[in-house]
Amino acid sequence: MNLGQDYNAIFSKIRDFEANAIGQIGEEFLKSVLNAIDEVINDGIIHDEYDIMTKSGVSFEVKTAQKGRTNNTFQFNGINPRYNYDFLICLGVREDKLLYRIFKKDEINYIHKERKYFMKQNEFKKQLVPMNPDNQVNYKLTLNIKELEEITNLIKELERVLGLD
């Protein structure tokens, strides 16, 4: 617990939550946003390959992380490049605001020569790093605050990716 610390910022209580709880919060948040613009058709059903499916047939994998304690980065864990989803949404929670970035599934590229996965989006390129040396299934992606968008743009971008704009 962070006793004696300031809890005045809008999301400050999140610092006391475990990673799984933060992930569930992010998923529920995205479901509520998607329900406002499209319909989530399998709310509450656990899937192996995606977290959310909309009525329009678009699937989302949601990863939520809080800002690191000593630097301005977020580590999004448990990304499986082989899973079957249309979009990966990374939600970054700071104590004072929410940030995000949306990636198309086909922006995850395996570079055989380097034997590594990369997230490539226009000029942006970041390596997906194995969660641990023996795990070649789940990866992590570290993003800087500057590589994420303000949450105020999320609905417009979701409408665009869903073809509703």
Stretches with model-predicted labels:
Residues 1-55, 63-165:
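Nucleic-acid endonuclease domains
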